[in-house]
Amino acid sequence: MAISPEFLTSTLGFTVGDGDTALAVGSGSLPVLGTPRLLAWMEAATCAALEPVLQEGSTSVGTRVQVEHLGASPVGAGVEVSASSAYDDGRLHRFTVSARDTATGKVLAAGEITRVVVDEERFMARTVG
């Protein structure tokens, strides 16, 4: 059963800390929000959007990411990340994601993240070598 796309939305707020910087996560040499951390925050928003509709024993896994990191955020900056369903077929969910600076409203990143709903046990059984 497909779920109404406008129902699957989530917005999360974060403050950039020292451990979130490109320098700290190894993706650069500057003390600004690192792209890997920003992407993790955006994925967390997609997970939060899907959580209320997942059946017991199910979870979702990321399968595709297309994100542009458009602006730098210093330590102490507030960042709001949002995910909104753009497409779903019951298993596959494509989200439009964005991040903005909470003080200025400036768009920091935008793109799409795709997740697929899977059975937790069956998925993990396939990962055993």
Where are these regions (language model features)?
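Catalytic strand-loop segment that frames the active site of acyl-thioester-processing enzymes
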Residues: 1-34, 51
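Generic structural detector for well-ordered beta-strands
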Residues: 13-17, 68, 114
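Residues at secondary-structure transition points
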Residues: 33-37, 74
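Intrinsic-disorder/low-complexity, polar/charged segments enriched in Ser/Thr/Lys/Arg/Asp/Glu/Gln
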Residues: 5-11, 64, 78-80, 92-94
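HotDog/MaoC-like acyl-thioester-processing domains
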Residues: 7, 74-75, 85-129
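Hydrophobic beta-strand-centered segment that forms part of the acyl-chain substrate-binding groove
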Residues: 47-80
